[in-house]
């Protein structure tokens, strides 16, 4: 497209969106339904429908239908009144984000005397005829009775979700393809592509997981949306206190020194229109990977003494809302979380004595030249702090029109430092397999050679307007802009002789993103159609492109034009979803969409601040957006009043994923002069591709007759050209013989995943929950003895053993002073299953040359080094290292108490 046409298109689209209002209607829903006479079913036009406590309401139309737009997410009482009929109220009407709650109300006629108001308790329809894609609404009451203590654990229990190495994959996509929002503001770090901010379950009222059929309002995401709705203060004071620990009785192998305390409290403040809710949570644990690192005692407030543990996490939340009237509402919220931990590294696990003169390590000092060396203390202390502050304004202009405006700031501060040292205070670690032959693999002197500090800030402004034009069309349009500020300092091998280290990466860049959408929800004859169009524009910034030009000049090519219309990337995304109720017990849905996502900013800007990065990959700010085309069809069926099934089939075509590729080079270029005539540069580019297909099944039994439960099953195949964006770099570096020429199973591909949940309870007295999850093994690449180069044909050609976990939770409840107190016990992995987490956890910067997996030939885990090769012998002599990181968390029991009021 010509530059002037592109500018005209962007300007017109922005003007059309700004002509309305701004945002993202995500924390509001809709109440709709019919009001008829109980006697003959005739429509009762002009009946008055009110949502109590909100000031929202409407009149019934001639056909008996009504719709109330812009109802904040929550639980309400709906009252219906009409002259000549007894008023009726429906209690516990649940309104969910971006969804319609259907009500069918019948009024009885009055004759002479006035009848009392009839009260009816509403239940959420077991069939969601409004949904056009896969959506999982996670009930917070459900998580409270299960062995679920974090948002991540709640999401991992859903169909189509795989939790691998602490990263969430939805329907076979890469982990960075999942975005998380709190009340419509993104809390995913665009720099590294993950979700850093931890939100306590005690602060949440709702979790929504979208894995297919996203509306046009969702952009810059390919695989999944996680919507979190935080609690608001109610008209009365309420709160929760929960404490959990595994410190009971004598410590044994199931003891991880775990403590978890969470608090929440809210209610009216000064006036009934001003309300608040605040929560806090702390979690401390030494984990099952206990290190011997000494930790000094600290003091809090002058009298509380404690020691930090291997992992230390906290989260804070504070939210204030003011209801100006039933039509206007302002919410201001702060969210913060942090974690400080020392990761376990097997090569640094030795504690003993080192002699720099003798070049020898031993368990005790052999003479005066030996000094104490705590290996675990010389791994980095990693500290992350995440903060989000936002302001949300909701305004209902009429029963059919409302808008929402949001302004937010999200920041991440990350530090990775050994013993709080400056880079010039680092000591280069021992090259262990050469420095001390008696201690192969283990580091016995020096520091982990990595020093890192980065900060990323994202400013967000967004808004939308929703208009119910008539009973058929609901129009929604909006605009969003994000501004990113990035500051990175990353050093490898810094020390007193070279304070800046090698491969140093230092930069400061700003970039921004603009998006808008228009969608129409069409309802007619029971059918719902969601059709939308989205526009996204990304500008990496002139500074980044000019820095990238230094790389091009280094390789002998002219630089790129850094002008606005040359450096910006834009896309238009169509979305379509259809739902059709076949009967009162069946509903069919289908959706199609194109989803674009800019690569994470880390790979766009890496090493653009300087040109001395060696042969590591250059960032590329001119990369295109990654693309996913998704199709889905599903059906819901209600078997009984409490039993419902949901089946969905999906297919994803993925291309333009981030990968690495040997860069072009002009003969005699400055790059060859700097690194040698055979050196090859590596650059990030849109190289990788893949596909995912699968079927999901969920059977849910609502609570009745003292039990509830669910069964989910997912069959999927996730294949692609690469699981690792650095695969091309490995080819250049000699770690891989060639790039694969066909799609291969991805690292997180688990073909069969089953999850079951059974809850048995006597309400108000006791309860017991059992969770069982099972998945077939993930793929792995066979490693053959003394082969330094992996064969592309063998990548992920075999599979590990299946993974299985059983968790239980049992509680006993009492009513004390009218409030509920619960004592509970939680068992995790109660069968102590040894599930494989990793065949060969990283050993860098140790002697990796002789360290590898010997699972392929010996079927043993934990990694080993080949003593025969080190001694120059022809036979292979494996010396096992028994790295505990190869297994996931073993059995652990916890006890706790909670108090709700």
Protein language model annotation of sequence segments:
Residues 765-769, 773-787, 812-901:
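C-terminal beta-signal and adjacent terminal beta-strands/loops
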Residues 303, 448-452, 457-460, 468, ...:
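Signature of Gram-negative outer-membrane beta-barrel scaffolds
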Residues 255-345, 381-403, 574:
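Transmembrane beta-barrel wall of Gram-negative outer-membrane proteins
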Residues 242, 650-653, 670-782:
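Gram-negative outer-membrane beta-barrel transporters
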Residues 23-121, 125-126, 162:
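Periplasm-facing N-terminal accessory domains of Gram-negative outer-membrane beta-barrel systems
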Residues 404, 408, 587-589, 593, ...:
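Membrane-embedded beta-barrel scaffold of Gram-negative outer-membrane proteins
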Residues 289-307, 344-379, 419-449, 493-504, ...:
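Solvent-exposed loop segments that connect transmembrane elements
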Residues 86, 94-103, 116-216, 220-225, ...:
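Periplasmic N-terminal accessory/gating domains of Gram-negative outer-membrane beta-barrel systems
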């Amino acid at each position: 497209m010509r530059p002037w046409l592109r500018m005209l298109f962007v300007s017109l689209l922005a003007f059309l969106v700004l002509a309305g209002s701004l945002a993202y209607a995500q924390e509001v829903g809709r109440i709709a339904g019919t009001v008829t006479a109980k006697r003959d079913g005739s429509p009762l036009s002009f009946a008055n429908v009110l949502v109590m406590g909100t000031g929202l309401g409407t009149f019934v139309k001639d056909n008996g239908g009504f719709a109330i737009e812009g109802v904040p997410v929550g639980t309400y009482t709906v009252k219906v009144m009409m002259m000549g009929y007894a008023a009726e109220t429906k209690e516990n009407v649940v309104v969910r984000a971006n969804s319609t709650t259907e009500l069918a109300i019948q009024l009885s006629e009055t004759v002479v005397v006035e009848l009392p108001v009839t009260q009816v308790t509403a239940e959420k329809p077991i069939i969601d005829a409004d949904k056009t894609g896969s959506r999982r609404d996670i009930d917070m009451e459900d998580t409270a009775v299960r062995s679920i203590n974090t948002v991540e654990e709640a999401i991992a229990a859903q169909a189509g979700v795989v939790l691998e190495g602490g990263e969430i994959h939805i329907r076979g996509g890469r982990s960075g393809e999942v975005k998380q929002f709190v009340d419509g503001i993104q809390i995913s770090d665009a720099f590294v592509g993950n979700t850093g901010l931890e939100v306590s379950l005690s602060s949440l009222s709702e979790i929504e997981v979208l894995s297919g059929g996203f509306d046009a309002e969702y952009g810059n995401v390919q695989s999944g949306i996680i919507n979190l709705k935080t609690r608001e203060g109610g008209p009365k004071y309420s709160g929760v206190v929960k404490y959990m620990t595994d410190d009971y009785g004598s410590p044994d192998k199931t003891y991880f020194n775990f403590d978890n305390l969470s608090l929440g409290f809210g209610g009216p403040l000064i006036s009934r229109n001003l309300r608040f809710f605040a929560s806090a949570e702390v979690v401390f644990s030494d984990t099952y990977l206990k290190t011997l690192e000494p930790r000094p005692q600290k003091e809090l407030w002058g009298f509380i003494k404690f020691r930090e543990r291997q992992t230390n996490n906290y989260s804070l939340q504070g939210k204030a809302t003011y209801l100006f009237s039933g039509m206007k509402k302002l919410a201001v919220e702060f969210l913060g979380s942090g974690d400080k931990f020392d990761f376990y590294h097997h090569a640094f696990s030795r504690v003993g004595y080192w002699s720099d003169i003798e070049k020898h390590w031993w368990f005790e000092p052999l003479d005066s030249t030996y000094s104490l060396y705590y290996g675990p203390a010389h791994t980095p202390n990693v500290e992350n702090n995440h903060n989000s502050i936002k302001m949300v304004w909701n305004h209902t202009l009429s029963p059919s029109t409302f808008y929402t405006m949001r302004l937010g700031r999200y920041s991440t501060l990350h530090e990775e430092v050994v013993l709080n040292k400056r880079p010039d205070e680092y000591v280069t670690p021992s090259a262990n397999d050469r420095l001390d032959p008696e201690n192969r693999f283990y580091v016995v002197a020096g520091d982990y050679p990595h020093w890192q500090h980065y900060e990323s800030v994202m400013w967000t402004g967004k808004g939308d307007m929703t208009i119910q034009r008539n009973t058929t069309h609901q129009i929604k349009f909006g605009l969003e802009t994000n501004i990113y500020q990035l500051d990175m300092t990353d050093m490898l091998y810094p020390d007193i002789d070279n304070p800046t280290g090698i491969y140093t990466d230092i930069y400061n860049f700003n970039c921004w993103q603009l998006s808008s959408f228009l969608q129409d929800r069409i309802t007619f004859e029971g059918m719902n159609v969601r059709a939308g169009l989205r526009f996204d524009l990304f500008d990496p910034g002139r500074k980044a492109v000019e820095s990238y030009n230094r790389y091009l000049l280094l390789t002998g090519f002219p630089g790129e034009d850094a002008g606005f219309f040359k450096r910006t990337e834009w896309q238009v995304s169509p979305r379509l979803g259809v739902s059709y109720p076949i009967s009162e017990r069946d509903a069919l849905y289908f959706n199609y969409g194109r989803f674009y996502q800019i690569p994470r900013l880390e790979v766009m800007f890496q090493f653009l601040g300087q040109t001395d990065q060696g042969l590591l990959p250059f960032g590329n700010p001119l990369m295109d957006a990654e693309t996913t085309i998704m199709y889905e069809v599903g059906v819901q069926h209600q078997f009984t009043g409490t039993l419902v099934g949901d089946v969905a089939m999906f297919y994803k075509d993925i291309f333009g994923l981030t990968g690495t590729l040997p860069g072009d080079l002009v003969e005699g270029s400055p790059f060859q002069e700097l690194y040698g005539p055979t050196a090859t540069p590596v650059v990030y580019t849109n190289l990788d591709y893949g596909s995912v297909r699968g079927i999901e099944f969920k059977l849910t039994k609502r609570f009745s007759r003292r039990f509830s439960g669910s069964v989910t099953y997912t069959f999927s195949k996730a294949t692609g050209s690469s699981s690792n964006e650095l695969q091309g770099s490995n080819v250049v570096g000699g770690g891989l013989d060639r790039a694969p020429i066909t799609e291969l199973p991805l690292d997180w591909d688990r073909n069969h995943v089953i999850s079951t949940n059974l809850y048995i309870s006597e309400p108000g007295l006791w309860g017991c929950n059992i969770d069982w999850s099972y998945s077939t093994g993930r793929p792995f690449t066979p490693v053959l003895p003394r082969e330094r180069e992996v064969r592309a044909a063998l990548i992920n050609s075999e599979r590990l053993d299946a993974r299985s976990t059983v968790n239980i939770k049992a509680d006993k409840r009492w009513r004390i002073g009218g409030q509920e107190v619960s004592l509970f016990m939680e068992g995790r992995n109660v069968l102590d299953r040894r599930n494989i987490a990793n065949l060969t956890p990283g050993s860098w910067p140790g002697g990796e040359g002789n360290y590898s997996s010997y699972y392929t030939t010996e079927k043993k885990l934990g990694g080993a080094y080949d003593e025969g090769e080190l001694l120059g012998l022809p036979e292979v002599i494996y010396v096992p290292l028994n790295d505990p990181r190869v297994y996931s968390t073993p059995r652990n029991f916890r006890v706790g108490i909670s108090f709700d009021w």
